Amino acid sequence: MNDMVNLLDFDAQGLLAYCESLGEKSFRAKQLQRWIHQSGAADFGEMTDLAKSLREKLATRATIQAPAVISDHLSSDGTRKWLVDVGAGNAVETVYIPEETRGTLCVSSQAGCAVNCRFCSTGKQGFSRNLSTGEIVGQLWMAEFAMRKQLGRGPKDDRVITNVVMMGMGEPLLNYDAVVPAMRLMLDDNAYGLSRRRVTLSTSGVVPMMDRLSQDLPVALAVSLHASNDALRDVLVPLNKKYPLAELMAACRRYLEFAPRDFITFEYCMLDGVNDSVEHARELLRVVADVPCKFNLIPFNPFPESGLKRSNNEQIRRFSQVLLDAGIVTTIRKTRGDDIDAACGQLAGEVKDRTRLAERGKFGKTVPIQVIGADSTHRMGSA
């Protein structure tokens, strides 16, 4: 089985090349793609419009293998979280969030994360490896057909998952070569048929890869901002030491020249006494002044030993009002799935930490540190 080719690893061009390598005509690739991604077929015997000789050939050479489900949890609010096996002792989490007019899937791109944002439990487990294209798109494949079964939907019914956010475990732009083909499949009309506006990639700010994505596959972009100045962001998002705010904002402006939406979504985790003052909000307005944007304020979801607390509702309201008064669309994310640890910042999975010390050092250590905000000082506890 280890020598089998996993067809989930192929986007349209890859599947075409594979079919041609088998001596098959090009139209077979589209047939095969529809069976896999639109019908959810995992058995070549089901693919009745393929020649029997091709089905037999595929059965001995290829497989359709999504990550195996280890656990499956349903929240009281309808959120569903899967823990899936990606081998070598690693597992990642995939979360489905139902809403009245859409169904959003939060997909992981790495086993662990080397960026090690201070407020995120994923980074505390270290980094093991990048996921393959098949492991990334396999989360969508698995979730779509699991949800269809749960809701009693057939192959001709509307898709359950209407939006995908690359906001699970990992930094997508540090796994570029696997993430982009996976997103191509999400957009492909012979696969999942999502629009570029309905696929959102969230990044902590890997500037060179943001520029590359703008040329290769400009989907909707969300940027994990979380701080109003470089001194604070260096602590909360250590990648900022490599790509500081001025460079990041310039990259956002360049990206908007090609983006499917005319704004960048900035994500901002609200941390009590750290980044949530009215002064921080005013400083933030100066940082994003030249970037058309909206803000998504995220109440912090505590996890053991984080040393951080969630801002209270009144403080979040005051912070958001500063942004709203400046004409910036600002939303406060409703916490979903927190009873099954599926809320933002809680995805940790099970990771065998193989992070090289040099890799960790690149983004800085987690230590007790005095953080100077816009007009206040706060000492963050050790994580």
From Swiss-Prot:
Function: Specifically methylates position 2 of adenine 2503 in 23S rRNA and position 2 of adenine 37 in tRNAs. m2A2503 modification seems to play a crucial role in the proofreading step occurring at the peptidyl transferase center and thus would serve to optimize ribosomal fidelity.
Protein name from the UniProt record: Dual-specificity RNA methyltransferase RlmN
Name of the gene: rlmN
Keywords, alphabetical: 4Fe-4S, Cytoplasm, Disulfide bond, Iron, Iron-sulfur, Metal-binding, Methyltransferase, rRNA processing, S-adenosyl-L-methionine, Transferase, tRNA processing
One of the record's GO cellular component terms: cytoplasm
Catalytic activity, reaction form: adenosine(2503) in 23S rRNA + 2 reduced [2Fe-2S]-[ferredoxin] + 2 S-adenosyl-L-methionine = 2-methyladenosine(2503) in 23S rRNA + 5'-deoxyadenosine + L-methionine + 2 oxidized [2Fe-2S]-[ferredoxin] + S-adenosyl-L-homocysteine; adenosine(37) in tRNA + 2 reduced [2Fe-2S]-[ferredoxin] + 2 S-adenosyl-L-methionine = 2-methyladenosine(37) in tRNA + 5'-deoxyadenosine + L-methionine + 2 oxidized [2Fe-2S]-[ferredoxin] + S-adenosyl-L-homocysteine
Family: Belongs to the radical SAM superfamily. RlmN family.
Keyword set includes Ion transport: no
Chief subcellular location: cytoplasm
